Every structure is written in C-alpha cells, then in structure tokens.
C-alpha cells in the first residue's frame, strides 16, 4: 500500500460510535503499544515507515522505539521498483534505511513485498515476456532480495493483492503472462530462498469479513495445502473508513477462515480514515473502530500482531489517494496521541489483565 495505488471502497458494515474511554494515566500506561501488546499475548504491535520522513528526528524517535512499536514494515522501500530498478541491478538502499535502525532497536520486521501488481519498474511492465522468461525474472528477484535480507524478516508478504473484490483473479502482468499459478510459484520460490523459519504470507485488503474475496483466498489456501504449497499466514490489511468499517465479529469471522486451516493471521496495514473536517463524533467512532480491530486480533489465538499503516497523520497515504479524507493515524500533526491511541492502549491493557494467552 501507500502513495501510488488506490483502494476500492470496501462494502462494509456501518460502525456505530461509542464513548471513548478516559485516557490511561502515566502510571497505568508505563509501556508503549509494543510493550502492552506483548503483555496482552501478541507477538508485536508495529508500524509501517516510509523513507520520506526519516529526516524528522521526532518521528524516528517514536518509530524506532521498541516499547512503542516492537515491529516495523518498510511501506515502500522493499518493493520491486526500488529493489530492482533495472533488470539484474539490485539497490537495497531504501530498504536498509528502515531495516538497519530497526535491527539496532531490536524490533521485529515484516518485509513487504516480493510480488505485487503495482510499483513495478518500466523494464518489467513493458517487457515482451513469455511464461518461462517471466518466471525466471520472478525467481531471480525473490532469490536476490531474500538472500540480501536473510534472517532479517520475521515474515514476508510474498504475494500482495492478487484478487478482485468479487473473488476473481486480478488481471495484471503476472496473471496475464503466467496464469494463476504465478502465486504458487512465488510461494515456492520464497520458501526455497528465504531463511529457515521465515513466515510466508498472502496479504490483501477487503478480506476483513466473510465475503467473495476472503472466501477466494481461503479456497486458494485449501488448494495449496492439498498440494503442499508452502504458506504460513494471511495478512488482513484493514484499511477502514469511519463511515463504513467491519464489526469486531466480522474481523473475527474472517480470521477464522484462515486460522481454522492452521494458518496465523495479522492485521498488517491498519488505519481508519475519516471525512474532513474532523469533529468529536468522527474521532470517537475512529477510536472505537481502532479498538475493535485490535481486540479482534487479541482475542484470536493465532493472530500474531497488528501493524498500523504509519502512525503520524502528515505521512499517511490517505490524503493523496482519497480527496477530502485523512487523519487516519494514531498521532496528529503535532505528534499528539489521539483518542484512538488511548483506545488501543486500553484494549491491550485489558488483554494483559485478562490473561490473554500464548507465548511466542
């Protein structure tokens, strides 16, 4: 996600607003969200980070604070257009700008993404490929990037957004040249070249409730399991709007499509955008949606964690993509914590108090 691609508006249930709980006191919230998530039984609570804001020291002091965010995702720096801008020429600079400080900070990394229909270099999109030659290009790309980041990634989003909302395969260079089996090839290449123990994910938006798209992903996984194609998890991106968002029960049911098959899940790109200008009612609704989303992960034993798609409003992808919408993140332009932040902290604190499970 971010900057250069546009989501279809999701056909989701209207979420009703609810009063926001009082902000936790300093004594009550000695830990940041990452620390609270661990106590609540999650592996992580993390954030996406984009390279364009790395010169802002106030931003980076939060982004690379393991107590606040104990996991990071490079929102753009590991995508094909940056990693292999020319065929066979690899440039890891943008990825390293996020991976290296996160390693120093002791944070977990979800690496994103080997294969997507967007943010591809021109040499790739304009090439005259056959099925065989394009598969060779794909394998070579995954081999080099996986080798470079060997041991650095808890998980890789191997394939990103392969389905349309109606559950059919998305028409793109991969499908049109290779056929739907390109997804299988990508996962087999990823298992072959990533370090042992790396979790391999399918990642998509619009699958946060049971619908044609999430059922298509489930069918893909069932087929993979029958034929021993490696896959470990499903990422539910979770880009929501204040006016239309799935209910807590929707997100739980969607996760169970995949956890029932033995896979882990994660909320991988959570944000909640609203129509501008903001007001108290919209802010309260946003806080509830954030809280319900995080609670849906805390309450699902095989949900490993939550990643917000950046935490600071000025660098959110939303305003550039959806005219008149914004303020989708946990912190405002002045780095003030919004009601949504405190609502998330409250959910995680309650999860810890309730003895919510599992050690990772």
Q: What positions do the PLM features span?
A:
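Substrate-binding cleft and catalytic face of glycoside hydrolase catalytic domains
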Residues: 34, 67-85, 93-207
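Fungal secretory targeting signals
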Residues: 1-25
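Glycoside hydrolase catalytic-domain groove-lining segments
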Residues: 93-108, 177-200, 211-278, 291-299, ...
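Acidic-and-aromatic substrate-binding clefts and catalytic sites of carbohydrate-active enzymes
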Residues: 47-60, 80-93, 163-168, 207-215, ...
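Boundary/entry segment of secreted carbohydrate-active catalytic domains
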Residues: 24-75
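Aromatic-rich peripheral "rim/lid" segments of glycoside hydrolase catalytic domains that contact
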Residues: 28-36, 63, 84, 122-123, ...
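Short, acidic/polar
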Residues: 51-68, 135-146, 212-224, 287-296
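A cross-domain feature marking catalytic cores of carbohydrate-active enzymes
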Residues: 47-51, 74-76, 111-115, 157-160, ...
């Amino acid at each position: 996600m971010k900057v250069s691609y546009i989501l279809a508006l999701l056909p989701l249930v209207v979420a009703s607003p609810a009063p926001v709980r009082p902000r936790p006191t300093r004594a009550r919230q000695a830990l940041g969200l990452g620390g609270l998530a661990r106590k609540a039984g999650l592996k992580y609570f993390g954030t996406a980070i984009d390279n364009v804001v790395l010169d802002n020291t106030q931003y980076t002091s939060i982004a690379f604070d393991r107590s606040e965010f104990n996991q990071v995702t490079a929102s753009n720096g590991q995508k094909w257009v940056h990693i292999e801008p020319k065929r066979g020429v690899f440039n890891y600079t943008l990825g390293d700008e996020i991976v290296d400080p996160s390693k120093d900070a002791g944070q977990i990394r979800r690496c994103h993404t080997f294969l997507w229909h967007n943010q591809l270099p021109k040499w790739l999109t304009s090439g005259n490929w056959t099925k065989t030659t394009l598969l060779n290009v794909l394998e070579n790309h995954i081999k080099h990037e996986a080798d470079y980041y060997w041991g650095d990634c808890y998980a890789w989003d191997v394939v990103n957004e392969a389905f349309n909302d109606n559950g059919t395969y998305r028409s793109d260079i991969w499908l049109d040249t290779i056929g739907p089996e390109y997804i299988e090839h990508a996962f087999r290449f990823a298992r072959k070249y990533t370090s042992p123990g790396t979790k391999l994910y399918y990642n998509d938006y619009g699958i946060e409730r049971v619908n044609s798209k999430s059922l298509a992903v489930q069918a893909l996984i069932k087929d993979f399991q029958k034929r021993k194609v490696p896959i470990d998890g499903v990422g539910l991106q979770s880009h929501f709007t204040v006016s239309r968002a799935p209910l807590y029960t929707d997100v739980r049911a969607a996760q169970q499509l995949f956890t029932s098959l033995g896979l882990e899940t994660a909320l991988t790109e959570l944000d909640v955008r609203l129509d501008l200008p903001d007001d108290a009612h919209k802010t309260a609704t946003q806080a509830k949606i954030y809280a319900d989303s995080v609670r849906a992960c805390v309450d699902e034993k095989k949900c490993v964690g939550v990643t917000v798609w950046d935490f600071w409003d000025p660098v959110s992808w939303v305003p550039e993509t959806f005219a008149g919408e914004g303020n989708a993140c946990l912190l405002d332009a002045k780095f003030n914590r919004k009601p949504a932040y405190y609502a998330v902290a409250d959910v995680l604190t309650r999860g810890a108090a309730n003895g919510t499970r599992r050690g990772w």
